[in-house]
């Protein structure tokens, strides 16, 4: 009897496994959305021994993309081409205007990063047609074609974390009361004072914090000069600075080491809703509408989505990190400070199967890798699955959806606990009616 039961269970398991594998094998890639951090840049501020005049790259000045950054982005573009043009033949070999849309924040370094990536993704080659893709002109680089990069307007400040948000300012005051933040602040002030003394800064040395970003950028281009001019500087001090400031970057995007409730307010939930929530929901909603168009093209109400295959956003480290926080996978970042490196990217692939069921994959890459890492199974809500159900992605998005909308929420004070409860009730109502 026991042998018969075991046999039945084995046959059932194999049948389920075969059905699952068939379902996986029949998955069809329908849409790709990706966001990346710009490439290597110059420092945002001058700091001895390197001043603004030393930063001559990318047209010159502070915060500009460097040749290293251009190369990093070109490499990322080459990886995109290998995956989506050559291996999967998902995108056309030549630039097709209706297939891809590239967007950028309104800064030189992100715009040129997008251009550099596109040079790697759609490089000059025999596949481009003279007189069609580029001019029939002897002075024109053969095979080279321009690809547009669309720049954010002020109305897109929410996804770029550029809006003036009163609620977020109140949250910063609240999280300052947490022991985790207090301890990090003590360590930061101690380091600021120590480094300020090295630079002979006597005015408010506890607030001297320019060195963390400056060192990270200077060491890529002026490392020998730093060691020659700063006898106290070394790698241990550099790493200490990056690790000391790492918690404050995390706090800003809603990542706290412990449950963090202040006056009944869930600080991580509130911060992530304001910081990562707008972009996460924009990505989810665009993907959902695309899948709907795939399933029912005749009733697709958004015409541009029908042929669109690749949507990209050239942005910044904090935006990439904010998304990783909402997805629960910040551990995929392996840098010293746990912060997305230059040219790191998060990519979301949307799939359908013959039964019109949709699912997603999440891919992460930093600039030390030659390919993307599939991190889908690491996302808690995906439960270790190879493909994450679209409904699970929806649950994540709605958990961090600013309600009733971002600007209204920003103007809603934390002083009313009911505002927090109402936000959670709205999330429940939306999930109930839309799942």
Swiss-Prot record:
Lineage: Eukaryota, Metazoa, Ecdysozoa, Nematoda, Chromadorea
Active site positions, chain numbering: 38, 317
Catalytic reaction(s) noted: a phosphate monoester + H2O = an alcohol + phosphate
Recorded GO MF terms: acid phosphatase activity; phosphatase activity
Cross-referenced InterPro entries: Acid_Pase_AS (IPR033379), His_Pase_clade-2 (IPR000560), His_PPase_superfam (IPR029033), Histidine_acid_phosphatase (IPR050645)
Entry EC no(s): 3.1.3.2
Presence of the UniProt keyword Transferase in the record: no
Protein name as it appears in the record: Putative acid phosphatase F26C11.1
Source superkingdom: Eukaryota
Disulfide bonds: 382-388
Enzyme class: hydrolase
Similarity field: Belongs to the histidine acid phosphatase family.
Alphabetically ordered keywords of this record: Disulfide bond, Hydrolase
Organism: Caenorhabditis elegans
Family matches, as CDD domains: HP_HAP_like
One Pfam family it belongs to: His_Phos_2
């Amino acid at each position: 009897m026991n042998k018969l039961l075991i046999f039945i269970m084995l046959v059932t398991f194999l049948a389920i496994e075969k059905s699952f594998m068939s379902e996986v094998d029949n998955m069809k890639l329908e849409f790709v959305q990706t966001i990346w951090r710009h490439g290597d840049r110059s420092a945002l501020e001058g700091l001895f021994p390197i001043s603004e005049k030393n930063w001559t790259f990318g047209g010159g000045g502070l915060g500009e993309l460097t040749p290293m950054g251009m190369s990093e982005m070109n490499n990322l573009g080459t990886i995109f081409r290998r995956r989506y043009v050559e291996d999967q033949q998902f995108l056309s070999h030549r630039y097709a205007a209706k297939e891809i849309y590239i967007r950028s924040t309104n800064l030189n370094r992100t715009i040129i990063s997008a251009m550099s990536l596109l040079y790697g993704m759609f490089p000059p080659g025999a596949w481009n047609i003279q007189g069609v893709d580029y001019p029939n002109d002897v002075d024109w680089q053969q095979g080279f074609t321009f690809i547009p990069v669309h720049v954010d307007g002020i109305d897109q400040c929410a996804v770029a974390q550029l809006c003036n948000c009163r609620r977020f300012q109140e949250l910063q005051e609240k999280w300052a009361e947490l022991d985790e933040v207090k301890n990090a602040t003590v360590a930061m002030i101690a380091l600021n004072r120590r480094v300020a003394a090295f630079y002979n800064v006597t005015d408010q040395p506890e607030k001297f914090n320019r060195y963390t970003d400056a060192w990270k950028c200077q060491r890529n281009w002026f490392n020998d000069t730093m060691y020659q001019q700063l006898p106290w500087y070394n790698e241990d001090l550099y790493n200490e600075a990056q690790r000391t400031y790492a918690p404050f970057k995390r706090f800003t995007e809603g990542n706290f080491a412990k449950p963090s409730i202040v006056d009944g307010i869930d600080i991580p939930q509130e911060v992530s809703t304001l910081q990562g929530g707008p972009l996460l929901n924009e990505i989810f909603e665009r993907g959902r509408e695309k899948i709907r168009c795939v399933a029912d093209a005749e009733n697709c109400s958004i015409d541009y989505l029908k042929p669109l295959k690749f949507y990209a956003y050239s942005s910044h480290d904090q935006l990439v990190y904010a998304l990783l926080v909402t997805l629960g996978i910040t551990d995929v970042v392996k840098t010293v400070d746990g912060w997305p490196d230059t040219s790191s990217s998060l990519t979301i692939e949307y799939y359908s199967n013959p039964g019109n069921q949709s699912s997603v994959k999440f891919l992460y890459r930093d600039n030390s890798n030659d390919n993307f890492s599939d991190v889908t199974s690491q996302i808690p809500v995906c439960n270790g699955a190879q493909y994450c159900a679209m409904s699970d992605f929806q649950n994540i998005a709605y958990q961090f959806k600013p309600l009733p909308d971002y600007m209204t929420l920003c103007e809603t004070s934390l002083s009313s606990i009911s505002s927090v409860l109402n936000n959670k009730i709205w999330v429940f109502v939306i999930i109930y009616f839309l799942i």
